[in-house]
Amino acid sequence: MSTTAGWSATRNKNLKLGCEAINGIVLMPGETFSFNKIVGATTKDKGYDTGHGYLEGEVAEVIGGGICQVASTLYVACVEADLQIVERYMHAYMPSYMGASTDATIFYPYLDYKFKNNTDRPIKVEAIASGAKVTCKILSVDTRDYYVKFETVIVKNIPWKTVYKEYPPDNEEGYTDGQVISKSSPYSSVESKSYRNKYSKETNKLISSKLENHETYDSRDKVVVKIVDPN
């Protein structure tokens, strides 16, 4: 499983550090993987730098920005390895590098991503970052007669709106009529479902379909100044 997001040297550095932290981890049957326990806080002391992330509902430069791409890529790899997901949280807004309802957000120490090795054999995590691309695999002996695809259905797409915010002509901010003051690009609200679909290796026909997630991403409207004279 591979994902690619917007390029920046500092964000790519964070991807590399995140992948290095989890790469090579081996889980015996019954053991649980915790992203926060293994990666920990993404601090400057560990070499993490700034990258795009969310801060108070807006895209901002944050230390460790991009680490969620590593968690999200690993999440899909785990589902397609048919592993048990123990803990996972969606982003407030649908990330551009993932399909709807297939992402996993990390916010240390509060929001974690965990999965369990519910197989009868050891598994190994492989995670590699190359520039803005992250590739994650779950390695093990595969004796199954089926394969899994993590597939998404968009239920509803609600377009973002233009919201006008009123200011007087002599406003302290110095805003002018028609000025766009939202800090980030607008996002539409998306309601989506994702399924853990099993297919026969022999016939490629669908064997079973299990709902993995049903959720709605927030919208982020475009905010425009409207100058209104109070007199």
Question: Which residue stretches match the model-derived regions?
Answer:
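Well-ordered beta-sheet/strand-loop patches within structured domains
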Residues: M1-N231
